[in-house]
Amino acid sequence: MIKLIATDIDGTLLKDGSLLIDPEYMSVIDRLIDKGIIFVVCSGRQFSSEFKLFAPIKHKLLYITDGGTVVRTPKEILKTYPMDEDIWKGMCRMVRDELPACDYFAATPDFCFAEDGGSPVFHLLRDSYGFEMREVDDITRLDRNDIIKFTVFHPDKCEELCTPVFIPAWNKKAHLAAAGKEWVDCNAKGVSKWTALSYLIDRFDLLPDEVCCFGDNLNDIEMLQNAGISYAVSNARQEVIAAEIGRAHV
């Protein structure tokens, strides 16, 4: 019996980078919650973005944000998985030196840091995704222990640009996953959306077989592989469809 449903957002429920969602989803989710199902929004988005997107039912949901690095209720943070400072600062320096066509940002549980308030990534995150943004002169000069995600950005081919140098340099020191054509997300090693879901499974004394997940991209693979029932949407990457062998595709 399914007791918890977790879904990705961008590419799964709506078009990437939108704050417009079909209102019918709200009705369906609300009915599921009324039947006792725990419903979890599980995305690479920031909490403020997820909270705005699901406004009509926002107080009834649980939230996994920033690619699995933050677990929270509408009112409080339950768990975070911060990155080692040397890792995210090293990533930042490498993007500057080796990937001049790319931009980047660093996320805390509540807002993101970027170095140019006029840059495309700053405006995209703030205006299209509804993120809380902070402009700083130099991310590597930040003295913080709450950076939970570092993300590389390119508008068309981020994964392609990161593959020759960046990904090989860091994929044994951190968890890296493409999240659409624009993003490569970097979490602490071993931390994915499934890590956060596992925390909730333990918290509510559930079994993986009592969990149902929906997703479309590489950062969804772990949760799709481990949930009792998983669904890849029709536009999912082929790697994602292949990963959830023997399960339904919608």
What does each of the following model-derived ranges do?
Residues 1-7, 30, 34:
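Non-catalytic pre-domain segments flanking phosphatase-related domains
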Residues 3-18, 224:
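Asp-based phosphoryl-transfer active-site loop
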Residues 9, 45, 215-217:
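Active-site metal-binding loops of divalent metal-dependent hydrolases
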Residues 11, 32, 67, 150, ...:
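Residue-level signal for inorganic ion chemistry
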Residues 20-122:
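Active-site phosphate-binding/coordination module
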Residues 36-40, 59-61, 148-149, 209-210, ...:
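Short active-site oxyanion
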Residues 94, 101-214, 218-226, 235:
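Conserved acidic, metal-coordinating active-site core of Asp-based
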Residues 248-250:
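Conserved small/polar residues in nucleotide/adenosyl-binding loops
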